[in-house]
Design a protein with these regions (language model features):
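Active-site-adjacent segment of 2-oxoglutarate/Fe(II) JmjC oxygenases
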Residues: 191-195, 200, 241-276
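A gly/proline- and charged-residue-enriched helix-loop-helix capping module
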Residues: 97-131
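Short glycine/proline-enriched turns and hinge-like loops at secondary-structure junctions
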Residues: 143-146, 153, 163, 220-223
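A short beta-loop-beta micro-motif enriched in histidine and acidic residues
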Residues: 126, 139-149, 195-196
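A short hydrophobic beta-strand segment most commonly corresponding to one strand
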Residues: 173, 222-238
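Transition-metal
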Residues: 1-107, 111, 245-253, 277-282
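Double-stranded beta-helix
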Residues: 153-209, 214-215
Length: 282
């Protein structure tokens, strides 16, 4: 168990005021945690399942690039970590809870905010941890995530540019429906959208709460960046996902369904229909 609180009183109040629909700029005490230094992360990468490691070239990427078009860097993931200050790349360590030490860290941090979260969206489900190791000026293109997320900055600095979940110009229903049917999460980009962004910059000791499904893109600043991302789902998020699958099913039958609802409106009827059809093998 962690001896000290990760979040101070101000951070708890900021998260409570924003969760679940709005982003929040928070402070935290994890910046000097030994599990987040580069030596520890290089060691973690050697213990992880290969399929939970990702890396690619990441400097000067177009914001609307697809996963399939993202360039490789010609290095192994371990060499990329060793040369991260010079190789213009990005490394993602996924599902870090597969390692007992990082699983304990994740549980302890999320347990601290569980009472706040659970009184709003119910139990924290499918908790996962991710670590991003990025070269200076690395770009993470525009995308959305199916989880609630707190991004903790441990080294270097970066800016996240967030957009509203309900902005149909940026993230129409078709993107949700495609993603929950197995499609990509990256989104196309138009330059005129830049003025709609809510940019939040973080340095070590700061964090961002990223709302479920909120489109965002990220760029690191002049130094190597290390960020810890802790995520969770809720019953509402799973109902939304299944409702998106049901809408896609209806479109294939020639029906134009109403869009899935945004929190706090639920999507249970469509969700239960999708689950019933899935059980029947449809």
């Amino acid at each position: 168990m962690m001896a000290d609180s990760v979040f101070n009183e101000h951070a708890h109040k900021a998260l409570a005021a924003s969760y679940p629909a709005l982003p929040a700029h928070l402070s935290h005490s994890l910046a000097s945690h030994p599990l987040l230094d580069m030596e520890a992360l290089a060691g973690l990468a050697t213990r992880m399942r290969p399929e939970t490691l990702e890396h690619n070239a990441a400097v000067d990427l177009p914001l609307g690039i697809s996963n399939a078009d993202t360039p490789v860097n010609g290095l192994s993931v371990h060499d990329t970590i060793a040369r991260i200050d010079e190789c213009g790349s990005w490394v993602l360590l996924k599902s870090i809870e597969q390692d007992p030490s990082y699983a304990s860290l994740m549980r302890d941090v999320l347990a601290e905010i569980a009472p706040l979260i659970e009184q709003v969206t119910g139990p924290m489900l499918r908790m996962e941890g991710f670590i991003f190791i990025s070269s200076p000026h690395a770009v993470t293109p525009l995308h959305f995530d199916p989880e609630y997320n707190i991004l903790f900055q441990a080294r270097g600095s970066k800016t996240m540019n967030l957009f509203p979940v309900a902005d149909p110009d940026i993230i129409g229903q078709q993107f949700f429906e495609q993603y929950f049917a197995g499609g990509p999460r990256n989104l196309p980009w138009q330059e005129e959208w830049a003025a709609r962004a809510n940019p939040i910059s973080i340095v070590p000791g700061e964090a961002i709460y990223v709302p479920l499904l909120a489109p965002h893109w990220v760029q690191t600043h002049d130094q190597v960046s290390v960020s810890l991302s802790l995520t969770w789902r809720s019953e509402w998020s799973f109902h939304h996902a299944d409702a998106c699958r049901f809408n896609r099913r209806l479109r294939r039958l020639g029906v134009s369904p109403r869009p899935t609802a945004i929190y706090p409106v639920n999507n249970k009827i469509k969700s239960y229909c999708q689950r019933a059809l899935t059980r029947l093998g449809g």
